[in-house]
Amino acid sequence: MELQMWKEILTPYDLAVEELKVKFNHIVKEYQQMNGYSPIEQVLGRVKSISSIIDKAQKKGIDMDKIETQLEDIAGIRLICQFTEDIYTVAGLIRERSDMQVKSEKDYITHRKKSGYRSYHIIVLYKVETLSLIHISE
């Protein structure tokens, strides 16, 4: 795939990450104004590098023309919480939002991986409005 094609594919993901970082940082500010404490301590986001996308697609046997529909973590938002209970509060907030739709959830806190890894993963569908409307998974 040419570099220009990659830019066209990844631009909506960049936009989604930036929009979601703004939205979640606003939630942090709202909580802090209401009671001085936010269940979200930090908001981070990223779009996978082209080489990481290619590597993951090859490992999973995904054709390059299907990466947008079959690779669910091209973009990601990481919400860091200070306390475990806060994670479930934040998961509830995400479920209640009308601007994103939960596609799947994996609770690696209750169901810890053998390696000891603990986290809570939520894959959401988020509508990005560009000149041509695009739906992406975050």
Which residues are covered by each model-predicted region?
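Short beta-strands and strand-coil junctions in structured, solvent-facing domains, enriched
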Residues: D86, E129-L131
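A short secondary-structure junction signal
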Residues: T89-L93, L133
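Short Gly/Thr-rich strand-loop-strand
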Residues: K103-Y126
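Conserved small/polar residues in nucleotide/adenosyl-binding loops
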Residues: I134-E138
